[in-house]
Amino acid sequence: MGKIIQLQEEERLRQGKNLLGFSGGVDSTALFFLLLEREIPFDIALVNYHQRAQAKEEESYAKELAHRHQKRCFTLSCPLGPSNFEHQARLERYRFFESLIHQEGYARLLLAHHLGDRLEWLLMRLAQGSSLSTLLGFSSREIRLGYELIRPLGEITKEALYDYLHQHQIRYFEDESNRDPKPLRNRFRPLSETLLKEHAQGLLQSFRFLQEEREILYGEDPRIRRDSLFYFPSQERETQNLHLIDLSLKALGYVMSQGERQELLKSGFCVVLKGKVAIGRSERGIFIAPFERVIIPKAQRERLRIAKIPPKVRPYCFMAGIDSLL
């Protein structure tokens, strides 16, 4: 008999409709069946990037599971090139999920990140240099524009998920890219797995303590998000502003170096980072968005100015059809 897996925010999941980001891998497949066991209402969404030979089979498996268990299954075909794949895949994935959430009336998005993912992130950030604001990575619950993002497996090891699937003889797919030694995360994975085998409870308790301390230090998240635009009112302390910018950049797949943090402070929070991300500040607050080069027609440019959206962020707002604050 395997250990009973406790889902975080379980009672909250029973309130309203849930959308599960599904891939057919160990994590999301385990979460699929754990939600079924608890009779928590959910549907699934899968993005097929056509990067792996088994991608078509994974999509078929998702549709089969959904049909068998009377769930809706939304799929998106999204071929991407190899350049900056992880970043682009993340943007497309969240764009797809959020469009479904708003169109179909889901209350929350469920993702299957687990304790190993949290430890890998922490190790990477320690190696690269990080403050507490970005050291912990994701939280079990985040408030987004119009929905909640919840990670029910945030305190569960991947080993426990394997045990659960094997015990119940549930089919799943292994992501071949996890064995690629090029991504930094994959190089930390063997160390993370060893640490969790020997010190899982101690590491989990440390994450809980650090999370509590981060909440005391930085308070609640005041950010508003629309597509890939983040906005929040300027905070009293610059450390709070930096923390919220760090979180927003992470969501866009970008992690600032120490030099870039200094540049950001010197600029008064008005800078473009490596031609990828634009940060601007106005009397309305601080804005973060992907950097775009586009000529904005005069009428739209004036609307963005009146809305007090900073110049460096305006091209993205124009491209995304955002001409006022929410």
Swiss-Prot record:
Compartmental location: Cytoplasm
Pfam families in alphabetical order: ATP_bind_3
Gene coding for it: tilS
Enzyme class at the top of the EC tree: ligase
Domain notes: The N-terminal region contains the highly conserved SGGXDS motif, predicted to be a P-loop motif involved in ATP binding.
Family named by the database record: Belongs to the tRNA(Ile)-lysidine synthase family.
Protein name (Swiss-Prot/TrEMBL): tRNA(Ile)-lysidine synthase
BP terms from Gene Ontology: tRNA modification
Chief localisation class: cytoplasm
